[in-house]
Amino acid sequence: MMGAEERLFEVSTPLGFTVPVMAEQWKKIVTFKHPIMSGRQRDIQETLENPGEIRRSRKDPNVYLFYRVERPNRWLCAVVKRLEGEGFLVTAYVTDAIKIGESEWRS
């Protein structure tokens, strides 16, 4: 049984901060927000570790969108909020467009 504090994985991002992904948060993402992401933990881990691009949210300067190409005109996006030096995975989804925002990093 997964406890609320069980860590699925933790990654270091190219921006120099870590993102621990907790089992309970991942469950919320795949149950309520984006069920299509079920079973794609490794893909999101890769997106956080090796994104093609990272953009900063226009609405919240502490939110970063990590993008990795999945196929032409299709990206995986991991949305991370950085608080007190560490990242928190807000959500993850597949998209056909990269959001407008300040580019922070490109591979």
Question: Which residues make up each language-model segment?
Answer:
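Ribonuclease/tRNase effector modules and their secretory precursors
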Residues: 1-107
